[in-house]
Amino acid sequence: MAQPQNDQAQPPPATLTNPRFTLELEFVSSLANPYYLSHLAVNYPSLLGISKSGNENEVNDDNSDPDAEAFAAYLAYLYSYWKTPEYSQFLTHPGATLRALRLLQEEKFRRDIIRPQVIERLAGVDLNGEQSAAEAGEQNTEQNKGDRGNVENQHGKT
């Protein structure tokens, strides 16, 4: 069994001149885009633990994919330090980025993001391409601005 590299145990220094930092910043920033999450789910389903048979009820714990486990561990590692103020200050969309990283900690969510309904809820757009009522209400109410907790609540109901 290969030992993890020592440099991944510690987050990179938070400086834009550090190549590893900028690479990870670009990756976590891209996770704020629900359509990028959909792209990952469709093109790399094994990384997210999505069954190749397409049966969403199929969960095979006996033969868990080592790539999916490694990717889940990498996401946990990223979330552990990007949520801190030292790092989150560099995010252009910290709310959406940290929400995506938090949701990606859940195995069920990683499997469910292949479903268009989940992606559309994250994007705040219904399947007809119109802005959802919840999203419209958030934009019209200043106190709710930036609060997207309804995605997490609705996630389990899809």
Curated annotation (Swiss-Prot):
Keywords per UniProt: Activator, Nucleus, Transcription, Transcription regulation
Primary location class: nucleus
GO cellular component terms, semicolon-separated: core mediator complex; mediator complex
Region (Disordered): 130-158
Biological process, per Gene Ontology: regulation of transcription by RNA polymerase II
Entry's Gene Ontology molecular function annotations: transcription coregulator activity
Superkingdom, taxonomy of origin: Eukaryota
Location of the protein in the cell: Nucleus
Record-stated family: Belongs to the Mediator complex subunit 31 family.
Function comment: Component of the Mediator complex, a coactivator involved in the regulated transcription of nearly all RNA polymerase II-dependent genes. Mediator functions as a bridge to convey information from gene-specific regulatory proteins to the basal RNA polymerase II transcription machinery. Mediator is recruited to promoters by direct interactions with regulatory proteins and serves as a scaffold for the assembly of a functional preinitiation complex with RNA polymerase II and the general transcription factors.
Subunit relationships: Component of the Mediator complex.
Identification of the protein by name: Mediator of RNA polymerase II transcription subunit 31
Native species: Emericella nidulans (strain FGSC A4 / ATCC 38163 / CBS 112.46 / NRRL 194 / M139) (Aspergillus nidulans)
